[in-house]
Swiss-Prot record:
One Gene Ontology biological process: carotenoid biosynthetic process
NCBIfam families for this protein: CarR_dom_SF (TIGR03462)
Biological function: Bifunctional enzyme that catalyzes the reactions from geranylgeranyl diphosphate to phytoene (phytoene synthase) and lycopene to beta-carotene via the intermediate gamma-carotene (lycopene cyclase).
Organism phylogeny: Eukaryota, Fungi, Fungi incertae sedis, Mucoromycota, Mucoromycotina
Name the UniProt record assigns to this protein: Bifunctional lycopene cyclase/phytoene synthase
Length: 608
């Protein structure tokens, strides 16, 4: 094999992988990820530089003098690059593997202190003992030198990280192991290539000479495995600390969620959260969040799955918002209770909303929960308590508007004309679109741009129109409701739908009515979807995917020629395809040439 320069090694084996990971994670990248990358790169570069100069000085490994661009101290410039590239690769891969589940759910305040002390102290004691023995075995020109240097470099850091996040790490075994093993195996393979090509060489005088596989010294395998373990553990520790900070925002942050804080202040807060044991956290808060997500998981598996493409902060708060909307909707739809009882519960919900939003965001929220606990289900109370965390983000008007939509249904108020259709859809859908958008904008410290809010409300109309077009028969048979404007129908058609006999209108008539509504949705969609491009970049993919998948139901209806389906839907594979392409903004609309669209996206990626 010809000699491979160190720079060529990066160009062929590390930078392409890093670039692929960056592209893969681009739709999900958040400010919290920025902090993680910056902090860990700083730690890796500062500590590894000293350590590596020490071992190169003692000839634990050396490099081909003609294979490097420059040398700083005793170490090639490309080696300093390796510190940064390896850190970014492993942390980025860990982010991708771990992002699909909320970090909050791996924090357990009800864990016993005895278990915590056992889980923390035993591994920490073992790691410190290894560090002590490795330090005393670090003798230059001895076979134990290189391996011992690796152990005393990595083990103390592992001990500190385990002390703060050990239990969290144990609760994520599969994700943690994948994040360690896959980058380690790849880097070991790349190391074999470099050693075989003569880019660098491991000294037999300061190593055991044992090989894991040909051209892979056991010390090199140990190095990549331990350093990647440090990076993954550090990622877990930061994820846990950030989850705690998000749950326990100070009143000052709640008063002004867009107020930026310095990197030093953020690191200081993370250190505080890192040191907090789970038992010192409010268990009720975690229970409420868990119950809220159970409501979401049971009520809408598709939304629960789709929410995974949002950043964890946004995903968590959107889940809380959805749980509140679903819990209140269930109160009004509970057929086991009389209409009057449901009206009373709706009035109580409205009182809760007014109590919540009448309070200043700068002061702790005080709610008389006993008043509600005696009259509402326990799961609903948990959703309400979790919802109070969004007080500083939301406005009262869209929440009240949503409750007006429930009242509309409880009173079985008819949709007389297109103005009623728009008003009802605004209550039950535009209001939710506005609230979701406010949550999204708040997490990225952006102003609540009125134009973006207006587009979100329009998108709510689009999705509700498609929903009504899809469910003409379902709403008729299950609810005895007609959400089509009665001005579109003859009197006898309205009566047939309200009596649960929508099918008697015939397939062609049902198709015509549904496509008329889909046409109105398509017309609004042209303007509404422009608002997505103004959202924070890490949320655009999730919003675009959710909207495109749902709006695509209209396309399914358009494809029907003779039969109106009882409940039109996309095939699972088609839904996944649209969602995936939408996340990366590669979904092809029918009115744009494919090549032009792809060229624009490729240009956007490199420019951005």
């Amino acid at each position: 094999m010809s000699i491979l320069t160190y720079l060529e090694f990066h160009l062929y084996y590390t930078l392409p992988v890093l670039a692929a990971l960056c592209w893969l994670l681009k739709p999900f990248h958040s400010q919290q990820d920025n902090l993680k990358y910056k902090f860990l790169m700083l730690m890796a570069a500062s500590t590894a530089s000293i350590w590596d100069n020490y071992i190169v000085y003692h000839r634990a490994w050396w490099y081909c003098p003609t294979c490097v661009v420059a040398v700083i101290g005793y170490v090639p410039l490309e080696e300093y690059m390796f510190f940064i590239i390896m850190t970014l690769m492993t942390v980025a891969f860990s982010n991708f593997v771990m992002r699909w589940h909320l970090h909050t759910f791996f924090i357990r305040p009800n864990t016993s202190w005895k278990q915590t002390l056992l889980v923390r102290l035993v591994p920490v004691s073992a790691l410190l003992a290894i560090t002590y023995h490795a330090w005393h075995l670090t003798l230059p020109n001895k076979p134990s030198f290189y391996g011992s240097c690796i152990l005393w470099y990595a083990c103390p850091v592992l001990a500190i990280l385990w002390l703060g996040a050990g239990e969290y790490i144990l609760r994520r075994p599969v994700a943690v192991l994948l994040s360690i093993v896959i980058p380690s195996v790849y880097l070991c393979w790349a190391d074999i290539v470099a050693i075989s090509a003569g880019t660098w060489h491991i000294s037999l005088r300061t190593s055991t000479g044992k090989m894991v596989v040909p051209d892979l010294p056991v010390e090199e395998c140990l190095f990549f495995t331990l350093i990647n373990t440090v990076l993954v553990f550090a990622t877990c520790a930061i994820d846990r600390a950030q989850a705690i900070l998000h749950l326990y925002k100070s009143s000052v942050q709640n008063q002004n969620p867009k107020q930026a804080i310095s990197l030093f202040q953020h690191v200081k807060e993370l250190a505080w959260a890192f040191c907090l044991p789970d038992q010192m956290l409010n268990n009720e808060l975690f229970d409420d969040l868990t119950i809220s997500w159970d409501i979401l998981r049971k009520a809408s598996k598709s939304f629960y799955t789709a929410s995974a493409v949002f950043p964890s902060y946004v995903r968590q708060d959107l889940g809380v918002l959805y749980a509140f909307c679903r819990a209140t909707d269930d109160l009004c739809d509970d057929e086991s209770k009389s209409v009057q009882e449901r009206r009373d519960q709706l009035d109580l919900t409205r009182q809760f909303v007014r109590d919540l939003f009448s309070q200043k965001t700068s002061a702790p929220i005080v709610i008389d929960w006993e008043l509600y606990q005696n009259q509402l289900p326990a799961s609903c109370i948990s959703a309400f308590r979790a919802f109070t965390r969004l007080r500083h983000v939301l406005e009262v008007d869209p929440v009240e508007e949503l409750l007006d939509g429930y009242k509309w249904d409880l009173e079985r108020r008819p949709i007389l004309d297109e103005q009623d259709l728009e008003a009802y859809s605004a209550c039950v859908a535009s209001s939710v679109g506005e609230m979701c958008t406010r949550v999204i904008l708040a997490q990225d410290q952006k102003e609540n741009d009125a134009w973006i809010i207006d587009r979100a409300r329009e998108m709510g109309l689009v999705l509700q129109y498609v929903n009504i077009a899809r469910d003409i028969v379902t709403d008729s048979e299950t609810l005895g409701r007609c959400y089509l404007p009665q001005q579109w129908l003859r009197k006898e058609e309205t009566e047939q739908i309200q009596q649960g006999n929508a099918r008697s209108l015939g397939d062609q008539r049902l198709l015509g009515l549904s496509l008329k509504l889909v046409g109105k949705a398509d017309a609004i969609m042209v303007r509404a979807k422009k608002g997505i491009d103004k959202l924070p970049a890490n949320c655009q993919g999730g919003v675009r995917a959710a909207c495109q998948v749902y709006a695509a139901i209209g396309s399914v209806l358009k494809q029907q020629k003779t039969t109106y389906p009882t409940r039109a839907h996309l095939k699972g594979s088609e839904r996944a395809k649209i969602a995936l392409l939408s996340v990366y903004n590669l979904y092809q609309s029918e009115d744009k040439p494919v090549a032009l669209r792809q060229a624009r996206k490729i240009k956007s990626f490199f420019v951005d």
